[in-house]
Every structure is written in C-alpha cells, then in structure tokens.
C-alpha cells in the first residue's frame, strides 16, 4: 500500500511529550472518588466511538514503540482497540488487540510502516449505555515525509538534472518516492552534494527496480539512504555509491586538523537487493579523506560477481566510525579473494581519545568472501584501543582465513574491545571454531559447530538446515521466514 493514501501521519515527539502521553493510561470510564455517589453525563444511550480527529500517535524517543491515545467518551465502559500492519492492504496483520479501561495503549513501532487502528466504544451496563454501533478507523504511517515522487520508467540522471528536483538551497531531508514495482535507470553520475537524500520505494513490501548503467554512480558528501530497491549492477564496474570528489570545506576538520571531511548523517542501504555487484558497494574516490560517521547495511541481500572486488573500499585515506551489517546476506558467486573492507584512515589521526572505530556483524550470513585472505585489508589501526569489533549470531562460510576473527581484527592484541556470540565458522567443509585462537578472537565457547547446510547457495538460497543454526535461528533471519 502506498503510504500517501493515508490521511493522517504520525506525530514524532520525544522525551517529555512521550512521558506525558504515557500518563494517559488512567481509566476513562466516568467515575468520582469522593464520598457522594456520582453519575456520568451520558446514560441510557447508544455511545459513539472516539472521533478520528482526536486520536494521537506519539513515538518513543528511540522510535521503537508508540503510544496511541484518543479522547474520552463519557459513559463508556471501556474501548476495544485493534491495531493492524497494512503494508499489504489485502492481508492486514494484527499487531495488537486489547480491551482497555483507559484512553491510551502502547504498541511496538516499526519504521516505514502503514498502520490501521480500529477502535470501538464499549457499553456500560451500570448506566444502561450500549456500545457504539460503528468503530472508528484511523490510518497512519511511520514514513519519512515525501519531498517528490519520481514517475515509473524514469532515468534518474535526467530527472535530477531538471530544475527544482534537487533544490540547491534546501537544508531538509529530501525523500524521493519511487513507484513500488516500478522500473528505473541510472544512465550517468548524480552528485547529491551535501543534501541528505533518501531514494526509496514508497512501499516496504514491494521494491522498485533500479538498473545502473555503464560507469554510472551515485555520489554524495552528505547523508544518503537507499531503501526498498532491487538494484542491478551488471552493466557497470564502478562503485554504486561514491563519496563526492568535490566536498565542501564546511565539513572539513570538524574534529582535529588532519584534513578529513566529516559526513555526519548516516549512509544506509536498507531493504535492498543488490545483484551482480562488479564494483564496490561504496568507495571514497578521489575527493580526499572522509570520516563517515555511520554506514549501515540492514535487511539486504548483496550478490558479488567480481572475485577481486573490495565491497567496502575506502582506500584513499577514509574510514567509518560505526560500520554495521545487520540482518543481511552478502555472498560471492565464486570465491572472492580480496578483502571485504579496506580503510586507509584511522581515529588516531584526529588526536581525540573519544574517537572510535566500530565494526559489527549481527544476525547475518556471509558466504565466499575474502577466501583465504584477510577479511579486513587495512593494517593502520592494528593494536589500537579505539577499535571495537562485534560478531554475533552470524553464519560465516568460506570467508577469510581459517582463523576468521584474526583476519577481521588483523592483530593479536587485547587492546580492542570485542564481543562474540553464537557464530558459525565453517570453511572447506569443516567447522573452524577451534581455530579462533589468540588475543581478541572468539573464545566464548558459544560457537555453533554443525554444518549450516545451505539449501542452494549457487541459486542464492541460504536457508540453513544445520541443527544448531535452525535451533538458534542464526544468520540472516529472512531465511527462516520464507
């Protein structure tokens, strides 16, 4: 369902507003705590359900939950509320149902989701009030507001070259909607400059399709997000996303004096399927040294076809402060023998003890990456206390050297902060958990040792059949939801 069909959007409030709203959980059925008996204003009536105009949705500060409240209906005996996820309008999914003696309730909140609330006022036998004959239906969503919609069949390079589609003076987050299931092309480079830009399908459930032409790239020196897109890279060997060759000096030396350009807003790949990747997923080009504060690959499938490709290639002198791969599958059709990620910058150069470099792999499936090679190619940060590594609940097959952890850390040192839990280290048909030895490596004793037994990796099916992996549901969770 296209989010624009909804007439109401959620209101995001933080801190005090959220706390105040949660206090609305008192009983909204009329009552009086004094000594005298009290009667409600409404008796011997058929009640109405709360008016949609008075319903409010307030997100928690971290966005993980929300409080939904409505105006009191006098004489009510309570309310029956049903909250649905309607991303697929033909198959609503019940999120929460409750009979409530109050005028609010809490529910989990998902990003980029269409919701429908149905609420009915219940009767009150004591005062002979009957329940409402009709329920109130209230639609809302958790999408970032749309700046412009891009028609199906558009060449993005041509479209963004037209006046007004990328306003030079805008300081807002520019969110562009592509039609769900629509087809789009990128015939040449687009440099979004310092704009914070999101390109997305307007439906979380139905990706738009984007074909990258020969030599075409998406460039930025600001925050940038690709969401819910199927991206075909077969025609190009260039980086899908490249840090701009012409960054503005306004983002230079925000910390320290080492001439780094700082990208403060996140660069995100979310809900994307990237096929036939023959160039880097992201590279730093020739625009100077960058510090990318946040780089995230979340809920993605990335297929690599180049056996010498470095997918995360920041070799000009750049690095990422916080790099995370989460709920994703990244694989090579043939055994890739290059590093998976390469930085050539380091926090130490900023002369600030608070600067960190974090690398995390969470609930992800990695296959045939950096086979018999170092998973991380850089050595400039070896042995430094600024390093943080997290590998948890991942299935790692034919990646790195026999000691995968060492090929990731590139050091035998107690300096970095590390966290491991329930990973599979499988290589050349054998469990390699016993090889994860040395300072900083996985010695938690939590590794899973059964063959993950992917159903058909050659066809891109990484559903595990190994008993321990199935029991623990490790790796990319999508394979358990087929």
Feature annotation, model-predicted:
Residues 106-128:
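Beta-strand-rich modules
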Residues 442-482:
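C-terminal accessory segments
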Residues 1-6, 15-58:
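Bacterial Sec-dependent N-terminal signal peptides
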Residues 222-233, 261-276, 291-308, 319-336, ...:
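Right-handed parallel beta-helix
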Residues 153-157, 170-197, 202-213:
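N-terminal extracellular ligand-recognition/capping segment immediately after the signal peptide
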Residues 63-75:
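Conserved aromatic anchor
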Residues 185-198, 209-263:
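Extracellular beta-strand-rich solenoid/capping regions of secreted or surface-exposed proteins
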Residues 29-42, 123-145:
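Extracellular fibronectin type III
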């Amino acid at each position: 369902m296209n989010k624009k069909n909804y007439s109401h959007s959620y209101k995001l409030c933080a801190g005090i507003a959220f706390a105040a709203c949660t206090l609305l959980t008192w009983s909204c059925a009329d009552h009086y705590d004094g000594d005298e008996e009290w009667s409600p204003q409404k008796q011997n009536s058929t009640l109405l359900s709360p008016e949609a105009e008075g319903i409010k949705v307030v997100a928690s500060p971290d966005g993980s939950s929300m409080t939904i409240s409505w105006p009191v209906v006098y004489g009510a005996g309570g309310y029956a509320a049903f909250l649905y996820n309607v991303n697929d309008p033909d198959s609503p999914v019940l999120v929460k149902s409750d009979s409530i003696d109050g005028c609010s309730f809490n529910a989990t909140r998902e990003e980029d989701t269409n919701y429908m609330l149905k609420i009915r006022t219940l009767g009150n036998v004591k005062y002979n009030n009957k329940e409402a004959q009709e329920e109130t239906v209230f639609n809302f969503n958790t999408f970032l507001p749309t700046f412009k919609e891009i028609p199906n069949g558009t060449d993005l390079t041509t479209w963004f070259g037209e006046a007004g589609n990328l306003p030079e003076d805008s300081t807002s987050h520019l969110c562009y909607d592509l039609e769900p299931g629509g087809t789009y092309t990128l015939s040449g480079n687009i440099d979004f400059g310092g704009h914070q830009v999101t390109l997305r399908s307007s439906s979380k459930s139905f990706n738009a399709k984007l074909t990258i032409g020969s030599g075409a790239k998406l460039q930025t020196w600001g925050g940038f997000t690709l969401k819910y897109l199927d991206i075909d890279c077969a025609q190009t060997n260039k980086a899908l996303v490249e840090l701009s060759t012409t960054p503005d000096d306004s983002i230079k030396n925000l910390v320290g004096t080492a001439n780094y350009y700082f990208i403060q807003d996140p660069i995100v790949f979310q809900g994307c399927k990237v096929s036939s990747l023959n160039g880097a997923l992201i590279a730093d080009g020739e625009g100077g040294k960058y510090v990318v504060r946040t780089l995230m690959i979340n809920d993605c499938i990335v297929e690599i076809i180049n056996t010498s490709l470095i997918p995360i290639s920041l070799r000009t002198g750049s690095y990422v402060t916080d790099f995370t791969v989460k709920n994703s599958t990244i694989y090579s059709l043939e055994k890739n023998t290059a590093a998976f990620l390469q930085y050539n910058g380091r926090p130490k150069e900023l002369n600030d003890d608070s600067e960190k470099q974090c690398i995390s792999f969470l609930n992800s499936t990695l296959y045939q990456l950096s086979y018999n090679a170092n998973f991380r190619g850089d050595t400039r940060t070896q042995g430094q206390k600024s390093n943080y590594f997290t590998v948890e609940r991942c299935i790692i097959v034919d990646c790195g050297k026999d000691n995968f952890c060492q090929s990731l850390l590139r050091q035998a040192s107690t300096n970095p902060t590390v966290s491991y839990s329930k990973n599979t280290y499988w290589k050349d048909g054998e469990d390699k958990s016993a090889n994860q030895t040395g300072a900083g490596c996985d010695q938690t004793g939590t590794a899973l040792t059964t063959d993950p037994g992917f159903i058909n990796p050659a066809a891109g099916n990484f559903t595990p059949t190994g008993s321990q992996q199935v029991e623990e549901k490790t790796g990319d969770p999508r394979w358990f939801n087929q």
